Every structure is written in C-alpha cells, then in structure tokens.
Swiss-Prot record:
One of its GO terms (cellular component) is cytosol. Mg(2+) binds at residues 40, 62. One of its GO terms (biological process) is division septum assembly. The gene is engB. This is Probable GTP-binding protein EngB. It comes from Salmonella typhimurium (strain LT2 / SGSC1412 / ATCC 700720). NCBIfam families: GTPase_YsxC (TIGR03598). Disulfide bonds: none annotated. Belongs to the TRAFAC class TrmE-Era-EngA-EngB-Septin-like GTPase superfamily. EngB GTPase family. Residues 25-199 form the EngB-type G domain.
C-alpha cells in the first residue's frame, strides 16, 4: 500500500454537476456532510494546507462539486454540503439530485467519507448518503467531527453508539472520531485513503458480475 503525500494535493476544478466533471477514470474518494459538519476543515487538516478547501461562515455556500488531485489519477472530491435550513427547498432538491447522481453513476468513485458533528450524528440525509453508497457497493468512512467538543467518556459513548447504528446498513462502513483542531483521527483518515487509492477501480468486476 502506497503512503501518499496529501500535502501535494491541489485544486483542479469546480463543477455544477456530474456532467461537467473530467473523464470518469482513475480513483476518486468523495467527502460529504451537512453544511456545518466541518468538511472543509477536515480537508485542510488532511492536506496540511490552511486554505485548500475554503471554509465559509455561511453554511450552504459551497454548492459546487470541487475536485482536488493528490497525484495523477487520484482525486479527492468535495461534494456540496447538504441539509442547511436556510437554503431554499428547490436548491436543496437540486443538490440532493447531484449528490445521488454522483454516488450512483461515477465509476471511479472508490470510497465515501461522510462527516457528521459528533454531537448530532446520523441525521436523515447522513443516513441517505450511507445508504446510497452501500447500495452502490462503495466503502464508507464516517468521521465524527468536532470530537474535541466532548469529554473523553461522552466521545467514546457517541463513537460506540454510531458504530452500533451503522451495522444496520449491512455494508462496509467504518466509524472514527475526528478533530481538525486537535488533529485527532487524521492518521486513520490517511490510512483509509491510502488503502482506497491502492485498490483498482472495480469497474470490470461489476461488469463481469452482471
């Protein structure tokens, strides 16, 4: 398994939907989460760059699919944040269509990182994202972000509760606590990404099994 240098990650492009993404080849790992789940902070912490992914004081501002390249043919995909109350209903539906379309149709997608505030995990849309991924045979890493906001005992209790809950999806779903502030869980995230990026995209296997 190759240990990739995530500090080399650089921005490639933004796209309004899957049709505007570059060719569907190589390996992609997508990051998804509610608009206030700390997705941008996690990407910046992973890559040790302060402003790779722009953090916004206004949740719901990031409406585009943002692509970052780690090395040639290996990309991180920052999906639009979802579930923010003040976003108009039509825009919410548009985002959800874009997210669903990407998860179901993108052949180069190898893994999905779903970020949730450890204090408010497994909201309806979080569960929908995991369900979509499992149904598409995509491995999932759930990061319970802002873990530094809870004392050690409460943090472990939340982690165990979510680990128990995701068993119901009957898929490959791993759960870890994460804190951008304290750099907690960053090594686990890098290890998971390294393993995903080391795998061959499973396109042929899917076609052979049909």
């Amino acid at each position: 398994m190759t240990n990739l240098n995530y500090q080399q990650t650089h921005f490639v492009m933004s796209a309004p939907d899957i049709r505007h993404l570059p060719s569907d080849c190589g390996i992609e790992v997508a990051f998804a989460g509610r608009s206030n789940a700390g997705k941008s902070s996690a990407l910046n912490t992973l890559t040790n760059q302060k402003s790779l992914a722009r953090t916004s004081k206004t949740p719901g501002r990031t409406q585009l699919i943002n692509l970052f390249e780690v090395v040639d043919g290996k990309r991180l995909v920052d999906l639009p944040g979802y579930g923010y109350a003040e976003v108009p209903e039509e825009m919410k539906r548009k985002w959800q269509r874009a997210l669903g379309e990407y998860l179901e149709k993108r052949q180069s997608l190898q893994g999905l990182v779903v970020l949730m505030d450890i204090r408010h995990p497994l909201k309806d849309l979080d569960q929908q994202m995991i369900q979509w991924a499992v149904e598409s045979n995509i491995q999932v890493l759930v990061l319970l972000t802002k873990a530094d906001k809870l004392a050690s005992g409460a943090r472990k209790a939340q982690l165990n509760m979510v680990r128990e809950a995701v068993l119901a999806f009957n898929g490959d779903v791993q759960v870890e606590a994460f804190s951008s502030l304290k750099k907690q869980g960053v090594d686990k995230l890098r290890q998971k990404l390294d393993s995903w990026f080391s795998e061959l995209a499973p396109v042929e296997e899917i076609q052979d099994g049909e």
